Regions:
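ABC nucleotide-binding domain signature
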Residues: 31, 70-72, 76-86, 181
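Helix-to-loop junction immediately C-terminal to a conserved catalytic motif
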Residues: 48
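Conserved coupling/switch loops of ABC nucleotide-binding domains, chiefly the family-specific signature
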Residues: 54-57, 202
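ABC ATPase NBD Q-loop/coupling interface
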Residues: 57-76
Length: 344
C-alpha cells in the first residue's frame, strides 16, 4: 500500500503542496484533478523522488522517504507514463520496451496485450499517438513497478482516441495489479476511470472520494463547480429529525437533500443540468432563457428564474428554444441533491 502522510512541498517561500494525506491500495487507480498550477504534477514528481519534500513522509513496501531522509527514484521502483510519450526515436518498439529489461518475456506479454505485436520493428515516427502511448505503457509495466504515475497521458490525443485508450490503460493497470496515480485536467476522464478521485485546489486536497461522491456530494462549492456544470438554487431545509425524508423546498419543486457543512434553514441547493426539465410550450412560465449552447447530443440552456436565480439546464438536442423565450423549468430528479449553507 502506498501511504502519504502530511506531505508538503515548498518552492522557496511558496507552499505548492500542503499536507497531502492519502493511502492507495493494491491495483487501485486514483485520479488527481484540479486547475492549472494546483500542484498535480508536483505531487507526481515528489512521489517519484524527482524533487525533495519539505514536510511529511511517503512509504511503500520496504522504503520510506521523509524531508530528512530522501529516497532517490532508482530505489522506489516507480513507473512513469508521460503525456509526450518519452520514447527513444532511434529505437524500435521492441527495443524501447526492452530497454534495460532483463526478462524479455515480460516485454512480449505487454506488447501482445496492448496490441503492439505487429509493430515490434517499427520506429516511433511511424506510430500514431495512441500507439506511442501504448508503447510507453508497455515499457513501464514490463519493468514490474511497485506503483505507476501517469502525467496526463491522453492530453496529446484526439477526443475519439482518448475515449477508447483510457479504457485500455485502465484495463492494463488492473491486470498489472499495481496502484496508480493518474493526473488529468479532464473531469469526465477522472470520473469514468478512477476508483477514487482527488480534487486539488491551490495545493490542498479538497476532497478524496469515489467518483459518485465527488460529483453528487462535493465537499465544497469549488469541488461542485470544478467537477461539472453547477448551479446553486435558493432553498429551505429543515435539518431536524421531524424532516424524515430530508426534503428540500424550492420555488421549482421539492427534492430529497443531503445536507453538507451543517446546512439548515435558508440554504443553497446544488443543481446539475440533468436534474431539471425545460418546457416552452406550457401556458405557465417561471423563467426566461438567457442563452443556449448546442453540444451535439444535447443543448445547454442558461435560464433566469423569476425569483432571481440562474440555472443551467441540459435537454435533448431536438428541443430548440431561442434566447429571451419565456419557459417553465422544474426539478425532475429523484436522487438526493447536495445542500450547502446559504452563501451571504
Amino acid at each position: 500500500m502506498l501511504s502519504v502522510n502530511n506531505l508538503s512541498v515548498n518552492y522557496g517561500s511558496t507552499r505548492v503542496v500542503d499536507k497531502l494525506n492519502l493511502e492507495l491500495g493494491q491495483d487501485e487507480i486514483l485520479m488527481l484533478v484540479g486547475p492549472t498550477g494546483c500542484g498535480k504534477t508536483t505531487i507526481l514528481q515528489a512521489l517519484a523522488g524527482l524533487i525533495p519534500i519539505s514536510e511529511g513522509s511517503m512509504s511503500l513496501g520496504n522504503w520510506q522517504s521523509t524531508a530528512r531522509k530522501h529516497v532517490p527514484p532508482e530505489k522506489r521502483n516507480v513507473g512513469m507514463v508521460f503525456q509526450d510519450f518519452a520514447l527513444f526515436p532511434h529505437l524500435t518498439v521492441q527495443q524501447n520496451v526492452c530497454f534495460r529489461l532483463k526478462d524479455t518475456k515480460l516485454a512480449d506479454h505487454w506488447l501482445k496485450l496492448l496490441g503492439l505485436d505487429n509493430f515490434r520493428d517499427a520506429k516511433p515516427a511511424r506510430l500514431s499517438g495512441g500507439q506511442k502511448q501504448r508503447v510507453a505503457l508497455a515499457r513501464t509495466l514490463a519493468h514490474e513497478p511497485s506503483f505507476v504515475l501517469l502525467d496526463e497521458p491522453l492530453s496529446n490525443l484526439d477526443a475519439a482516441l482518448k475515449d477508447s485508450l483510457r479504457w485500455e490503460i485502465r484495463d492494463a493497470l488492473k491486470k498489472a495489479g499495481v496502484p496508480a496515480i493518474w493526473v488529468t485536467h479532464d473531469q469526465e476522464e477522472a470520473l469514468s476511470v478512477g476508483d477514487r478521485v482527488g480534487i486539488l485546489n491551490k495545493g490542498v486536497l479538497e476532497q478524496l472520494d469515489t467518483p459518485e461522491a465527488c460529483y453528487s456530494s462535493p465537499a465544497s462549492r469549488f469541488v461542485a463547480r470544478f467537477m461539472g456544470e453547477a448551479s446553486f438554487l435558493s432553498a429551505t431545509f429543515d435539518g431536524s429529525a421531524a424532516n424524515v425524508d430530508r426534503t428540500v423546498a424550492t420555488d421549482i419543486g421539492k427534492v430529497p437533500g443531503t445536507p453538507l457543512q451543517g446546512a439548515n434553514g435558508n440554504v443553497d441547493l446544488l443543481v446539475r443540468p440533468d436534474d431539471l426539465s425545460l418546457n416552452a410550450t406550457l401556458s405557465e412560465t417561471n423563467c426566461t432563457v438567457e442563452w443556449v449552447r448546442y453540444e451535439g447530443e444535447s443543448r445547454l440552456y442558461a435560464v433566469m428564474l423569476d425569483s432571481g436565480d440562474e440555472l443551467k439546464v441540459r435537454v435533448s438536442h431536438e428541443n430548440a428554444i431561442k434566447p429571451h423565450t419565456r419557459a417553465f423549468v422544474q426539478l425532475i430528479t429523484t436522487h438526493p441533491l447536495a445542500v450547502f449553507p446559504r452563501k451571504n
